[in-house]
């Protein structure tokens, strides 16, 4: 039996022993070395040749990933590791670090129980380090820390033992400060990383060595010895003495939870169903014989196998040829293959029990975020996966040959399934297909893949910024009349209170129609008036619909219609047909026709929509634009050039710090002004500057620009150039 076959046999055995399983994600800021680390772990496990690790990029399986040298999709692999005489199954996911692909990280975190957070020893904690930690901790995923590129501190920066220790300690302190502020309340202390206990390792993924305190105790190696080995040109020996795979995976096995431990606190957080039910108990007790409960966290399309879904099995067993039910889309499908991932390959094991990360094929309707269960035992859905960022840039695409239009529609449907952070819409007026994504690079990758992988010739427009609509003031009470004039709704609007708005952005408050009274308490804790808090009917697009009427006959019967109308109105605001956000609507009175026939959808929907539009237009409507945080690090003499470039982009200076001869600068810049930034900053710093970006959120567009931008958007969308005033909607 080859080493690989033996490993597959072992994996099949360990799959059934949850205490010997670890599901982990590797995540970091871009370029800090996740993929090099994952590749070396794969090589250590015999999954790719050791010579190719770091070059072959076994986890970066797509051609564009290898060409660009960055990870775009999350990739998976299962491997076996021995720790203290026992063998363990490690299911690993490598995730992208670039801000544009944050959606993959969030989804990967739903599949795992632990995360190896990789931080570059030279750069330290960077913006995406904070974002990925936030994504992990929000999903109740426990972190350990690997400080990578320590070889550079020794070989390039020539640090001695004391300075080395100082630099490493400052990174650990910063990471722990983040864990303390972001971890779930009951885990804050337990989850901070600890050098003494060995939940922090240091090393070089590139040179294939790593060390932590347990390894120091075992080998009697010190940082001084490591520095000496590097200085004496014996770095290659370090990988024999301090093998990266062993140190890293031992840390994972010892400090990250097995699924049977993690599911006890993760399932109640990510699943809304009744924990005491049969399904709930199957998940908590990790029973492979109970009802199937799984969540699809990623979907890819393979030329031969069709849709290949990644699925975390939370209960029961996924079986080949079985019929499963897709809870969100209400579809049924027959599983063709069920097995595990091994980098670029999949191994069909026929069955995958609870606690593992599986792949499955044959599920045509699968999309990331979908709950799956057995067709004869339907379960409650898992919580939707919240994405921290949201689309900020759009491109219009059209098929080069009009005969390809049906194919384009099909391909776009597939693309949005593979990547739920992509939004695909059709502009009803112009017939254009619009793809919105997290940034220019994200859309470039998506459209290139349509051309190269899906073999479809398309024309792609210049990127268009996504704006949002909101209000600055408080409208008077507006009357919305139904077409038959027998139904009238009286509402007003004002900006939603900031603490509530922020909590919705952070995902601390969930959106949706309010079903239980308990939610009111969360609103009250954020400063909302008690009476209003108890009367919230719906939270949608970071806006609230509050019913403050009393004793209106038939109101409950039209409630669903009112909320449908409210949500539809916010999808396309009255100013520029962009989404409306951050609004608080109060319904203060209503008059309804006593006969149900006269208060149906055709009457109620237009009445509420008109009232919403008129109220927005009378409350000083405004546009919000997406803002990016930009961090530039460059030699001091280029600081002036950088500031000038940023100011030309309507940017703001947030902070500047000098570290030796290097200036570290923080800015905030509208995304509308970021096009071409990479090239410009390269020339502004003589090629010596580095930069990274992070999404800040949406902020009010300067008022002097608003009329022009509104006109531009409306004209592009085929609407009249000027928006209608409130009187237009009260006719
Ligand atoms: N000197 C040194 N270079 C390293 C080390 N680890 C990674 N690198 C280099 O750093 C660069 C980025 O490494 P990757 O592994 O692609 O980084 P990543 O975090 O996966 O990047 P994305 O996938 O694009 O987010 C590559 O040029 C690596 O060769 C290390 O330990 N030491």
Curated annotation (Swiss-Prot):
Principal location listed in the UniProt entry: cytoplasm
Q: Indicate which residues the UniProt annotation says bind GTP.
A: 28-35, 94-98, 148-151
Domain (tr-type G) ranges: 19-234
Would the keyword Ribonucleoprotein turn up in this protein's UniProt record? no
- Gene3D superfamilies associated with the record: 3.30.230.10, 3.30.70.240, Elongation Factor G (Translational Gtpase), domain 3, P-loop containing nucleotide triphosphate hydrolases, Translation factors
Keywords from UniProt, A to Z, are: Cytoplasm, Elongation factor, GTP-binding, Nucleotide-binding, Protein biosynthesis
Q: Which CDD domains match?
A: aeEF2_snRNP_like_IV (cd01681), EF2_II (cd16268), EF2_snRNP_III (cd16261), EFG_mtEFG_C (cd03713)
Under SUPFAM superfamilies, the record lists: EF-G C-terminal domain-like, P-loop containing nucleoside triphosphate hydrolases, Ribosomal protein S5 domain 2-like, Translation proteins
Query: A Gene Ontology CC term for this entry?
Result: cytosol
Which terms does the record give in the GO molecular function aspect? GTP binding; GTPase activity; translation elongation factor activity
Q: Where in the cell is it found?
A: Cytoplasm
Q: Record's InterPro entries?
A: EFG_II, EFG_III/V, EFG_V, EFG_V-like, EFTu-like_2, G_TR_CS, P-loop_NTPase, Ribosomal_Su5_D2-typ_SF
- Residues where Diphthamide is found: 598
- Membrane as UniProt keyword: no
Its biological purpose is as follows: Catalyzes the GTP-dependent ribosomal translocation step during translation elongation. During this step, the ribosome changes from the pre-translocational (PRE) to the post-translocational (POST) state as the newly formed A-site-bound peptidyl-tRNA and P-site-bound deacylated tRNA move to the P and E sites, respectively. Catalyzes the coordinated movement of the two tRNA molecules, the mRNA and conformational changes in the ribosome.
Q: Report the family membership.
A: Belongs to the TRAFAC class translation factor GTPase superfamily. Classic translation factor GTPase family. EF-G/EF-2 subfamily.
Give the protein's recorded name.
Elongation factor 2
The beginning of the lineage is: Archaea, Methanobacteriati, Methanobacteriota, Methanomada group, Methanobacteria
């Amino acid at each position: 039996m080859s080493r690989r076959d033996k490993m597959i046999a072992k994996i099949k055995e360990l799959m059934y022993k949850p205490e010997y399983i670890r599901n982990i994600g590797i995540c970091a800021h871009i370029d800090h070395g996740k993929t090099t680390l994952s590749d070396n772990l794969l090589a250590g496990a015999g999954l790719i040749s050791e010579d190719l690790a770091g070059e072959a990029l076994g986890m970066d399986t797509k051609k564009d990933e290898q060409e660009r040298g960055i990870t775009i999709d999350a990739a998976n692999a299962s491997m076996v590791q021995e720790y203290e005489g026992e063998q363990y199954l490690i299911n690993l996911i490598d995730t992208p670090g670039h801000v544009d692909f944050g959606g993959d990280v969030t989804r990967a975190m739903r599949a795992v129980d632990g995360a190896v957070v990789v931080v570059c020893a030279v750069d330290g904690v960077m913006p995406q380090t904070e974002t990925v930690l936030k994504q992990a901790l929000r999903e109740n995923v426990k972190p350990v820390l690997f400080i990578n590129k320590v070889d550079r501190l020794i070989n390039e920066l020539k640090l001695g033992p004391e300075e080395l220790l100082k630099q490493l300690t400052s990174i650990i302190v910063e990471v722990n400060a983040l864990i303390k502020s972001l971890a779930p309340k009951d885990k804050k202390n337990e989850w901070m990383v600890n050098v003494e206990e060995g939940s922090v390792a240091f090393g070089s993924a590139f040179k294939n060595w790593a060390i932590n305190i347990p390894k120091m105790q075992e080998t009697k190696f010190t940082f001084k010895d490591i520095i000496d080995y590097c200085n004496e040109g014996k770095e290659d020996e370090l990988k024999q003495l301090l093998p990266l795979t062993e140190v890293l995976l031992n840390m994972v096995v010892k400090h990250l939870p097995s699924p049977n431990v993690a599911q006890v606190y993760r399932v109640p957080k990510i699943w809304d169903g009744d924990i005491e039910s049969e399904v709930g108990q199957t998940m908590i007790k990790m029973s492979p014989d109970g009802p199937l409960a799984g969540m699809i966290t990623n979907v890819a399309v393979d030329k031969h196998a069709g849709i290949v879904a990644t699925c975390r099995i939370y209960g029961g067993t996924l079986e080949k040829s079985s019929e499963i039910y897709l809870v969100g889309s209400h579809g049924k499908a027959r599983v063709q293959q069920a097995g595990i991932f091994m980098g670029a390959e999949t191994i069909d094991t026929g069955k995958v029990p609870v606690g593992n990360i599986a792949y499955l094929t044959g599920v045509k309707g699968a999309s990331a975020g979908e709950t799956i269960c057995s067709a004869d035992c339907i379960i409650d859905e898992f919580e939707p996966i919240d994405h921290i960022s949201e689309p900020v840039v759009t491109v219009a695409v059209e098929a080069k040959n009009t005969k390809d239009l049906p194919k384009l529609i099909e391909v776009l449907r597939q693309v949005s399934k593979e990547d739920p952070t992509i939004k695909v819409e059709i502009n009803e007026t112009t017939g254009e297909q619009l793809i919105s994504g997290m940034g220019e690079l994200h859309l470039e990758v998506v459209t290139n893949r349509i051309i190269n992988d899906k073999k479809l010739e398309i024309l792609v427009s210049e990127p268009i910024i996504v704006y949002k609509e909101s209000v600055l003031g408080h409208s008077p009470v507006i009357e919305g009349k139904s077409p038959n004039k027998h139904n009238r709704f009286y509402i007003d609007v004002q900006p939603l209170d900031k603490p509530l708005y922020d909590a919705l952005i952070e995902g601390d408050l969930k959106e949706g129609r309010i079903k239980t009274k308990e939610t009111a308490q969360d609103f009250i804790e954020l400063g909302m008036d008690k009476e209003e808090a108890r009367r919230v009917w719906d939270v949608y697009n970071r806006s609230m619909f509050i019913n403050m009427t009393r004793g209106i006959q038939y109101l409950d019967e039209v409630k669903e219609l009112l909320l449908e109308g409210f949500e539809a109105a916010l999808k396309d605001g009255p100013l520029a047909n962009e989404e409306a956000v951050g609004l608080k609507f109060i319904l203060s009175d209503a008059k309804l026709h006593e006969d149900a026939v006269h208060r149906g959808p055709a009457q109620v929907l237009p009445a509420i929509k008109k009232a919403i539009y008129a109220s927005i237009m009378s409350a000083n409507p405004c546009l919000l634009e997406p803002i990016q945080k930009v961090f530039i690090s460059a030699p001091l003499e280029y600081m002036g050039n950088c500031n000038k470039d940023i100011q030309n982009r309507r940017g703001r200076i947030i902070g500047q710090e000098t570290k030796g001869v290097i200036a570290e600068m923080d800015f905030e810049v509208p995304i509308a002004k970021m096009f071409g930034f990479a090239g410009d900053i390269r020339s502004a710093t003589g090629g010596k500057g580095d930069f990274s970006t992070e999404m800040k959120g949406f902020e009010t567009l300067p008022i002097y620009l608003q009329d022009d931008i509104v006109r531009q958007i409306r004209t592009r969308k085929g609407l009249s150039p000027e928006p209608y005033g409130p009187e237009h909607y009260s006719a």
